[in-house]
């Protein structure tokens, strides 16, 4: 491969890399809700409503018009109470206000590397904002306010020293209208939480009901946006991941049906609501003037006969974007890791290989180096073929220069004579290029795997590199990487074109500046790949 082909290859790789980093952030157009599909379901008679005191006896009268129903009254004398759920993985704080979630701190993940750093908090709401996991009943006979107070059946739950699951039940009754129960089930060793919502019709007329489960999150408009990760609403609709950029949320949007899950994500963590029946579930997104972003799952419309109950079942996942943990949920939640649509089939096995190596060396930096060596061994024959082809092309440079001078005014003849020269010396001009092109998808797959792997977050390597997911604080590895790239360029067969030679010499400088802010785990991969390539190039040159 001559210098021109190599230049085109390197520039193409650079363009792809820049595209992946700075441009590949767009979200596909949302799938609109199918308005023609019926979402109305008649609930089969369930367990009868439990006996009531005289004060709770149903009153006569027709149910309110679903389109004009107001929220049920809120008892202003109630005081908010907090219920703490403590497990080995997280500490959650629920509130009687809405039977919702007030705090969810992940014990195994910290905000920074500082010794006194706080655990990662998945809930962020400001004063007067409704908490996540609140419910409402839009277009129903009756609705509830997010400020409605529930009664909790226990003051706290401690699961740190047990393997048994526990329940937390919130209940509230509006006499003669409706009784609502929210039942959370916690498992000590899991991030997943089961949620069942039961609504009992206490009236004497059928109750038309359509439930919506919310995740509300405050997004600071002044916060610096992460160039490598998305923070905002995310959902899985009709087997496609939908991401909404918060800064572009101007009007409410609806997605679905066929919503497998929806929620809020950051680069490494996610809070997802998973409905029992995705085919009848739609999703709504909105942002208000106080920068509260709301994601709501809307279920099918139910008709609940008098004295009967409706049941709505969900699973909640609040935790890290660990591929194995997400995949175990069985609803495609692993797709929340942004490997990219055309790279995930390479990124996923590479990430799993990295985790496999870590089980033996217990250092992700070393695991990256070993994986780099294994990939280089896998592509060693292709690399040899590429370097040998470049060497053969270098030998033909004097003859090619003669042809260019001789036929400088006849491009057709120049092309014809050049191909004849290749044929005479049995040289394939693409022989050095194709083996390298085959390796490019593997590089980008590993790039994606390292960029979004939570395993690298706060994971130390050696000496000054204490977080493989963060940039090198002293820029030492990017500079060394640039030096190895410069050395590799010097060892590459030279071109007779001085302009191309100058451009190639600038490539290490460009890549060095690009890598200054890259996660150090990525830089380590590229650095050691360069070192191995230099060794292979030296071996080929010596053999020649």
Curated annotation (Swiss-Prot):
User: Some GO term, biological process aspect, for this entry: which one?
Assistant: protein insertion into membrane
Show the segment(s) annotated as Disordered.
44-78
Q: What is its main location?
A: membrane
Where is the protein situated, by its record's location annotation? Cell inner membrane
Does the UniProt entry include the keyword Transmembrane helix?
Answer: yes
Q: Name one GO molecular function term.
A: membrane insertase activity
- Membrane topology of the entry: Multi-pass membrane protein
CDD domains reported in the protein's UniProt record: 5TM_YidC_Alb3, EcYidC-like_peri
Keyword terms: Cell inner membrane, Cell membrane, Chaperone, Membrane, Protein transport, Transmembrane, Transmembrane helix, Transport
Q: Where are the transmembrane segments?
A: 4-24, 363-383, 434-454, 508-528
Single GO cellular component annotation?
Answer: plasma membrane
- Protein role: Required for the insertion and/or proper folding and/or complex formation of integral membrane proteins into the membrane. Involved in integration of membrane proteins that insert both dependently and independently of the Sec translocase complex, as well as at least some lipoproteins. Aids folding of multispanning membrane proteins.
Which NCBIfam families does the record cross-reference, listed alphabetically? PRK01318.1-3, PRK01318.1-4, yidC_nterm, yidC_oxa1_cterm
State the family named in the UniProt similarity comment for this chain.
Answer: Belongs to the OXA1/ALB3/YidC family. Type 1 subfamily.
The subunit field of the Swiss-Prot or TrEMBL record says: Interacts with the Sec translocase complex via SecD. Specifically interacts with transmembrane segments of nascent integral membrane proteins during membrane integration.
Name the UniProt record assigns to this protein = Membrane protein insertase YidC
Q: Which organism is it from?
A: Syntrophus aciditrophicus (strain SB)
Q: Name the gene that codes for it.
A: yidC
